[in-house]
Amino acid sequence: MNPSDPSETVEVAKATANLHDAHLNEKKAPSIDKDLAITPSIEEVPATTVIGATTDDTDLQKTYPTDEELRTLRRVCGQIPWTSYTVAFVELCERFSYYGTTAVFVNFIQRPMPAGSSTGATYDSSRVPGALDMGQQASTGLTLFNSFWSYIMPTAGAFVADQYLGRFRTIMYSIAAALLGHLILVISAIPSVISHPQGAIACFSIGLIIMGVGTGGFKSNISPLIAEQYREEYPYIKTLASGERVIVDPAITIQRIYLYYYLTVNIGSITGQVSMVYAERYVGFWLSYFLPTCLFLWCPTVLFFCRNKYYRVKPQGSVYGQAFRLWKLAMKGRWSLNPVRLFKRNDKPFWESVKPSALGPNRPQWMTFDDEWVDEVARGLKACKVFLWYPLFWLAYNQMLNNLTSQAATMHLGGVPNDIINNLNPLALIICIPIFDRVIYPGLRHLGFNFTPIKRITCGFVVAGCSMIAATVIQHYIYVKGPCGKEANYCLDEYGKYSPISVWTQAIIYILGGISEIFASITSLEYAFTKAPKNMRSIVQAVALFMNAFSSAIGQAFVGLSKDPLLVYNYMVVTILAFVGAIGFWLSNYKLDRREDELNNLPQSKYTEKSGVSLDEENARK
């Protein structure tokens, strides 16, 4: 041993504390993979140099709760590390750039160029900015494609992060791709290009694809990175100054981290959308694409200067291959072409027979992990099953990104841009998130009600359905009160006439939509992080995000309803599907709801990436 090497010294010190054996594999200083380093500034940092990596006996002094204490003591949040706030700021800048850009997509694609304008801008408060004049179906189709593409690419970003580059470096590469996409969007909107609609839409589409690659790689990795900065993994007892004994619960801390992470997302969203909508109206679309690009440059800047302070989990090679092999082994002898027989065979304890302890010395060479990692994989797959209902939730949410913006244009605007009204959604979130975190959730815990993630998500589906009821009713009265009946968009484009109903009537839709996101969307981030294996967090997060992409694909089937006079039926169908999702989600997951504490407190797992090396041999070397 080299006594001058601090990482080796820490490892020896840790090895003398038997009670820390469960933490050794995770907290061991990783060696830097020279082949993967893109620059010395963003290499993987040894865990012993990272803020939050414990190297003393603090854990030995903690008192862990008994089953009785888990049931009876009040649960509180732990302290959030400052590094999490820097990651949240990076997300704020990224969301400003993304939503500031996408906020003007509908008008850019759908509406015609105002008379006398070369940039799409208009000073006439009764007119709507526009550029390419491709209609509502085209704008709905392209915005749905953008949503689909941006949420399918996280799977690729997760694969690269978990197996090869790690989360930090994958984020940096993704930022570079997104910046390139933003620049191409700026080019598509400059006057010399926008005057040729076919060339502009081609340029716009290329920028959309490249930006989606960057957005996807960023999204699947930034949310696990922010929660990983909090290092506590198990609940422990703390005595407050008042003498009250409480449980510091990591699950509640992660819940708070994601609540305020989502708060910063929406601060970035609302500032980006509001400012860029006015830039679109008074200057032109090119400025609405250029300013978000400038702010996006803060993302790599902050990450670069904080790079040595972040806790980073080292990628562990072919972890996906290991998980697939494990599942394939568990399925051995269970396959059947008869669906009923297949279901019955898989109703038995699925994972117990393929645990290393059950296989004994005959276990395969590739099985370089312990029983606890098998439990983590099983838990992660259960989380993915939970997310399967989410497309029906996102189908309702996605109405705010396209059809409801078009609906606003056909209402009495009173000088307000039609694509600024949907900012009531992030505004509602900014107001409601602190209320839920400081009042509603603690109040429910104080009353003894365990508002688990499964219960919260179910409520999210119900509230989303209620928001779509409001959208259906409003669209019905637009047709009833409008000067052209059920041809509201034709009436607006040809005659500049609109329904006398105030656009602020839409507020109820966006407020209910925001509350539904607190219950369902934020909880999905929390659930993906807490239920995934530690070396597969990006991919489980990507599965949660992929449900949005799948929802966008389903939404393409409803594009035919995204036009007059069928819009009432469009919102009605989405309403029904949201309530069906709520019922189906609860019926398929209520048993999982009862195991929440058990799943959150699985024993620490051990995993080695070295193929052909048994776990026993790996432990002996330590």
Describe each model-derived feature in a short phrase.
Residues 2-5, 30-33, 38-124, 130-236, ...:
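Hydrophobic transmembrane alpha-helices of multi-pass solute transporters/permeases
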Residues 242-243:
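Flexible coil/linker segments and helix-coil junctions enriched in charged and small residues
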